[in-house]
Amino acid sequence: MTAETPTHPIALHVEGLEKSFDEKPVLRGVDLKVPRGSIFTVLGPSGTGKSVFLKCVANILKPDAGRIRFDGRELSPGDTAARDEFRRRCSFLFQSNALFDSLTVLENVALPLEQTTNLGKIEIQRRCRDALRQLEMEEFLDRYPAQLSGGMQKRLALARAIVTRPELVLFDEPTAGLDPLRRNAVFAMIAKYQRQFHFTALIVTHDVPEALATSDQVALLNQGRIAFVGTPAEFSISKNPFVSLFRDSAQALGESLAEIRSGRSTVSIL
């Protein structure tokens, strides 16, 4: 528990985060507090810096300025111990799942334990089997990722992420390229296992309906700045001009896609 908010401890505190590429600003002073044990989603149009933000938090990218604190401890560039501890207590789910096709389901899940712990082979096997059992994947232990459906591959990626028993799991566009039914299923899966394993989930996505149905809090990123932070209910009625524009655009896109799928409308391929 941190001393910042005793009634709602803050798992992750980001202050003034900045990042540029070729002198073009992508993040312009991002401030966020992610409550412990919550599902917190960062929304925004494509190209607004959501994935860059998440990769800065994960230490995949180095921010140009700003502070990131995890469990009250600053992850400063020179504090190797703090960063190592963060890596032990955090997992990252890549947009592509980043599964190894030459490894079985069981071997994929075992990989982070083999790389980051001193556990023996028997204990690693026990933990992996336990994680796969809890995610209802026991029957797939000896299969390879290519033999699984897209949804099962996503579940495998989550099993690998939670096998280290992380306190924070970062999700980078977890439903990219999926149809609405599978998007709903992925967000439902995240919500189910977040409750089961009690980790804090930080998600970046542009899928508004799914995020609002699943998240405890949402933030909206606009041109590298946070335009809104609040509950899904507050987001749905916000008068903030950019929130309204983004919300209406997402709704219009959803209605257009529904018409195309039903055959009531067509789309030109340019």
What is the role of each PLM region?
Residues 75-91, 121, 235-238:
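ABC ATPase NBD coupling module
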Residues 169-172:
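Catalytic Walker B motif of ABC-type/P-loop ATPase nucleotide-binding domains
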Residues 163-167:
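A short, proline-enriched helix->beta-strand linker immediately N-terminal to the Walker B motif
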